Amino acid sequence: MIQHFQPISAFKKDPYDKIIAFPKPRDAEIKKRIIELKKLGVSHVSFTGPLRIEKCQILGKGYVGMVVLAKQNNKVVALKIRRIDSPRKNMTNEAKLLKIANKINIGPKFIKNSKNFLIMEYIDGEKIIDWAKKSETKAK
């Protein structure tokens, strides 16, 4: 996957603003979240991945958030961004569960979290669901 990194200030511009404050970006929320990213040490983002939202490619989208590639302290990481319409008020519980899974070597390694973001190890490769489907087919 080609990784073109942009400064996190790119989130201020259309269409990237829809990723940091999905689904309805507002300037005040975008500014607040960019400050939050800076405090976490995130400097750059890359809009690449198999999923397309608006005109942006991202790694993933779910019920709680969107996942993009980012740089934190010059290291490539996966950045989960809490959706503004998420029923969860923060990423604390998700971070806690990831730390528990990490204790038995499951999942990407937890790095850091804040109210709206979860930073974890980026593992380049096949999605686990796709791998499992292939393995199931081979087993038959």
Language model: regions and residue ranges:
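Conserved structural core of kinase catalytic domains
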Residues: 108-139
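Juxta-kinase regulatory segment immediately upstream of eukaryotic protein kinase catalytic domains
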Residues: 2-57
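A conserved alpha-helical element in kinase catalytic cores
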Residues: 81-114, 135
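Generic structural signal for beta-strand residues in well-ordered domains
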Residues: 46, 60, 72, 100-103, ...
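ATP-binding glycine-rich loop module of kinase domains
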Residues: 57-92
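Short coil/loop residues immediately preceding or within conserved phosphate-binding loops
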Residues: 54, 65, 105
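Ser/Thr- (and often Asn-) enriched beta-sheet segments in non-cytosolic proteins
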Residues: 52, 71, 122-124
